[in-house]
């Protein structure tokens, strides 16, 4: 956002929406916001697309921004398009690069699991984009920065809502979260069994800030729980290193990991698509490759 604001010579505004979020405005300013619009109401205690769409749209109508950015998170990828419809404008989703061309946003995103890149322009304002997680370096907080905070009231007519919040259940997982892991070890259906898949956890004992993940096929085969699934129907991650083990590299899976800085493939099929997607690859049976690799790691340790 800071780079775009500099190119446009415009301030950075942040909308804080939720319940009890007023105290977070100083954090937003420290991270680069010039002005923070706070929508603090108990109706926003839990995310509901309808209420948040109204809030974002009403703030946008008051502020009249040229660009609106949201994270391409499970909530963001639902919220972004609904806000675009509300404001009658366009949106680019899951973007990995943002530039200013002729005073308007030009967004780049991956297609077909990273096989293609698409550039999207916008004919009217506001330009809306959801941003792929970890596509940009995070800002370092600067507590000396000053900014302005304004409380905004929005009108959410509860009688018009077609949905309601029921409950929130958080998946319990051991160790570091997939979204926070710098190294991810992902196993596919080619692992063959739950016992084979469980062997991947030996990596996490040797590599710091690492986590185990799965493909949809491995999860459907009950090698692990769905909370580990990466891809279109799972989580989107962008680690520094992504081990793709015994998986084919289908576009549906690559959509969740194509933002990885380095992909290391291990597959006994030399024609597997994953080798086209990876920076490094080993052709071989994972049952022979992984023990040798782990032995080398232990020697380094």
What are these regions (language model features)?
Residues 2-301:
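N-terminal glycine-rich FAD/FM-binding segment characteristic of electron-transfer flavoproteins
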């Amino acid at each position: 956002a800071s780079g775009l604001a500099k190119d446009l010579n415009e301030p950075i505004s942040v909308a804080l929406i939720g319940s009890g979020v007023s105290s977070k405005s100083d954090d937003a300013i420290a991270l680069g916001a010039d002005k923070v619009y706070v929508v603090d109401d108990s109706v926003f205690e839990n995310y509901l697309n309808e209420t948040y769409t109204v809030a974002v749209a009403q703030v946008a109508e008051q502020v009249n921004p040229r660009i609106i950015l949201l994270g391409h998170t499970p909530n963001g990828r639902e919220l972004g398009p609904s806000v675009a419809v509300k404001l009658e404008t366009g949106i680019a989703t899951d973007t990995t690069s943002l530039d200013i061309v002729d005073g308007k946003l030009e967004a780049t995103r991956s297609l077909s699991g990273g096989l293609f890149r698409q550039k999207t322009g916008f004919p009217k304002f506001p330009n809306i984009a959801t941003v792929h997680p970890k596509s940009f370096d995070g800002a370092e907080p600067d507590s000396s920065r000053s900014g302005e905070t304004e409380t905004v009231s929005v009108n959410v007519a509860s009688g018009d809502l077609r949905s309601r919040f029921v409950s929130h259940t958080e998946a319990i997982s051991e160790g570091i979260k997939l979204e926070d892991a710098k190294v991810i070890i992902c196993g596919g259906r080619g692992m063959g069994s739950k016992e084979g898949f469980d062997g991947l956890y030996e990596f996490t004992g040797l590599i710091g800030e690492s986590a185990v993940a799965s493909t949809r096929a491995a999860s459907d085969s009950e090698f692990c729980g769905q909370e580990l699934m990466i891809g279109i129907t799972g989580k989107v991650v962008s680690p520094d290193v992504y081990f793709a083990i015994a998986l084919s590299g289908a576009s549906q899976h690559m959509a969740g990991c194509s933002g990885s800085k380095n992909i290391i493939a291990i597959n006994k099929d030399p024609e597997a698509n994953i080798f086209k997607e990876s920076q490094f690859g080993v052709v071989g049976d994972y049952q022979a490759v992984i023990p040798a690799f782990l032995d080398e790691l232990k020697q380094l340790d």
